[in-house]
UniProtKB/Swiss-Prot annotation:
SMART domains: Aamy
Binding site for alpha-maltose 1-phosphate: K264, Q324, D359, N396, K535, Y536
The protein, known as: Alpha-1,4-glucan:maltose-1-phosphate maltosyltransferase
Keywords: Carbohydrate metabolism, Glycosyltransferase, Transferase
Catalytic-site annotation from UniProt: D395 (nucleophile), E424 (proton donor)
This protein's record includes keyword Mitochondrion: no
Organism: Cereibacter sphaeroides (strain ATCC 17023 / DSM 158 / JCM 6121 / CCUG 31486 / LMG 2827 / NBRC 12203 / NCIMB 8253 / ATH 2.4.1.) (Rhodobacter sphaeroides)
Root EC class: transferase
Length: 668
């Protein structure tokens, strides 16, 4: 009796759940766009087709079917896209998220009794077995359609009306399994043992989040006179130059008032001269803070003219969002609870022991600062959005709380989904990836320090094939005001051309800091820093001086703009080149109508001769086939015969090659 009571107890309140569980025979797992169990949104690009995949399977041998459903968040109607079987229980659908917005995604899967019946009866018929009862089962399956439209209902009724028990079995089966019947049943047959997956978040960025070319400058150094502070009007005069190079994002270091307390002098000196402008990252003075403009740059009227002029030149302005304050920032006086104070009553300066940053004070995100500081920082971003800025490069986001970024980016993008955040986070891999998960549309990367063939292949393979490709988009900056790469310090003009080609063609997003075009690389001895860095002084640049590489930059950006193959970073593929100093890789559209092959000599000091592989198999061609080739550096056209070819790349004349491949029958 006790055992019976126990069994009854286990049923109490659980029968409904049991029945739901029993009905869920189709398993859905391994979803490619599911990030941490749906905790974070996968990133896609609005208007781009994306492959949505999942492992879907059932017990036994019955056929199954599946569909992806998606909708824009806040709307009622789902858009259904049927999935196709790939291999090994993997299913796929191609989905386009039309709007730059938050979306939702889910899956349905079910046992397909009609297809199961059709396959089984076909086998029995082929074996010469009687199928009379099976045909009756087929009639009942056809009669079971419940959601048929008028056309499908009429088709099913016609098939049933034409069927008769006195007819030949093969003819009856052919009628019940005709292509028209199969299509109708796919649309409207009952979905037996329907399994519904959880709803997953998706964020569809605008294209600039995945494909952009950045040019970084300090507005104060654009007067062409090292003795005169630049203005926004000076920047406006430089816009044609930036656009002529082919860039589409013009990124400014901070444009706010600079603190006077503990101001840094040239080369980060602690003893500035009276006319030293200080570091733009020491934000805030009696003239204002993060929502103010440095008075020597201009005012909001001139900034508005700059934004408008940039748009007219096909450029977007990106601003630096640096959450740090100079010791005389207004917030310190108005909100002392937002900062750390030492036992002696002095404010704590920014430190990374043993380094000290005497001209910078960090905010504290908790204690008395929560929630008011969080609101204030969000409102700073929204303030600049209203001024026409839709892209923000965020300084050192890895030193601020993940919950803050998740909340702040969500707040901003809920109102302005076209806003893009770039994480300047040279940090540990997992931290960098977490920032992508919490909302950053782009991230700085380790590209700056990946110089060898093996390093580049390993790193790029990780970024383009592992799960992080669905939430972290790298931006390959070849240099920054803070990083003067060792490779460039010792490689001369050839090295600048090499790293330009790699950054521009490997990445969907890439950037250059001004001075790159004239191969500026004078270092502070023994450091990855620029000597006479314009972080601490005004500079005047002669970008037309002998040895500049403007033509290379124009060419790279032209190839990026005019070839659809360049847009999707994840379509990067590496190929064989029998030389450890040569990197071979390709990008193509899915239909292979635009197929580019790249060879880059990574050695800036010596010519390299090598045998390389022509990826004929990508076009379904045998190893002895031929392809027509266009050299995108000079426009020459010729034919490669066979899978292996030879090439020499001399870093002094031609450190890289870009080929467009045309398979037989492709339009020229």
């Amino acid at each position: 009796m006790a055992a019976a009571t126990g069994a009854q107890d286990r049923r109490d309140g659980g029968e409904e759940a049991l029945m739901r569980l029993a009905d869920a025979r189709v398993a859905i797992e391994g979803v490619n766009l599911e990030i941490d169990g749906g905790r974070f949104a996968a990133k896609v690009v609005a208007g781009w087709e994306v492959a949505v995949e999942a492992d879907i399977f059932c017990d036994g041998h019955d056929s199954i079917d599946a569909a992806v459903l998606h909708r824009q968040r806040g709307t009622d109607d789902w858009i259904e896209v049927r999935m196709e079987f790939l291999v090994n229980d993997r299913w796929q659908a191609h989905v386009t998220f039309a709007e730059n917005a938050f979306h939702e995604l889910t899956f349905l899967a079910w046992r397909d009794l009609y297809t199961t019946w059709r396959k089984e009866v076909a086998k029995k018929l082929a074996a010469g077995q009687k199928i009379d009862l099976e045909l009756e089962e087929g009639r009942r399956l056809l009669q079971s359609v419940e959601t048929a439209g008028a056309e499908d209902r009429a088709l099913v009724d016609r098939i049933l009306g034409e069927d008769g028990a006195d007819q030949e079995a093969g003819a009856r089966f052919a009628r019940m399994s005709s292509p028209e019947a199969v299509a109708a049943m796919k649309r409207c047959a009952p979905r037996t043992n329907l399994t519904c997956y959880k709803i997953l978040p998706i964020f569809a960025d605008r294209e600039a989040a995945a494909f952009s070319a950045w040019y970084e400058m300090m507005p104060r150094s654009q007067s062409d006179d090292p003795e005169r502070h630049g203005t926004f009007d000076d920047v406006i005069r430089k816009l044609p130059y930036v656009r002529d190079l082919g860039f589409d994002v013009l990124y400014f270091t901070p444009i706010h008032p600079i603190g006077r307390v503990n101001r840094k002098g040239r080369n980060n000196s602690l003893t500035p001269a009276p006319d030293d402008p200080g570091s733009p990252y020491a934000i805030g003075s009696e003239e204002g803070g993060h929502d103010a403009i440095h008075p020597e740059l201009g005012d909001f009227e001139s900034f508005g003219r700059l934004v408008e002029a940039a748009h007219a030149h096909g450029l977007e302005i990106a601003l630096d969002f640096a959450i740090q304050c100079a010791p005389d920032h207004p917030w310190i006086r108005e909100h002392p609870e937002w900062f750390d104070w030492r036992p002696d009553g002095t404010i704590k300066f920014a430190e990374n022991p043993p380094k000290k940053y005497e001209d910078i004070v960090n905010v504290h995100f908790y204690r008395g600062a929560l929630p008011e500081l969080w609101y204030a920082l969000r409102d700073v971003v929204l303030f600049w959005v209203e001024k026409g800025v839709k892209i923000f490069r965020v300084d050192n986001p890895h030193t601020k709380p993940f919950p803050f970024w998740e909340w702040m980016i969500g707040e901003v993008q809920s109102q302005h989904p076209d806003v893009i955040f770039l994480a300047e986070a040279f940090t540990r891999p997992k931290v960098m990836k977490r920032l992508g998960k919490v909302g950053y549309g782009q991230s700085y990367s380790y590209f700056t320090w990946r110089n060898t063939k093996a390093e580049l292949i390993d790193y790029l393979t990780e970024l383009t094939t592992e799960e992080c490709r669905h939430y972290m988009r790298p931006n390959f900056f070849a240099n920054t005001p803070d990083i003067n790469p060792v490779y460039l310090q010792h490689s001369g003009r050839a090295g600048f051309r090499v790293r330009l080609a790699l950054a521009a063609t490997l990445g969907g997003n890439y950037g250059l800091y001004n001075g790159y075009e004239i191969c500026e690389a004078t270092p502070v001895p023994g450091k990855e820093e620029y000597f006479n860095s314009e972080k601490y002084q005004l500079r005047a640049w002669d970008f037309d001086q002998p040895g500049h590489i403007q033509d290379d930059i124009r060419l790279m950006n032209h190839i990026r703009r005019t070839h659809p193959a360049m847009r999707d970073f994840t379509r990067l593929r590496f190929y064989d080149a029998h030389n450890d100093s040569v990197l071979a890789y390709g990008k193509s559209t899915e239909d292979k109508q635009d197929f580019l092959l790249f060879h880059v000599n990574l050695d800036p000091h010596a010519a390299q001769t090598f045998e390389f592989e022509v990826p004929l198999w990508e076009f379904g061609l045998p190893d002895d086939a031929s392809v027509e080739v266009e050299d995108l550096l000079n426009g020459n056209r010729f034919t490669w015969h066979g899978k292996w070819q030879w090439l020499e790349l001399d870093p002094q004349t031609r450190p890289y090659a870009v080929w467009r491949l045309y398979a037989p029958g492709m339009p020229r």
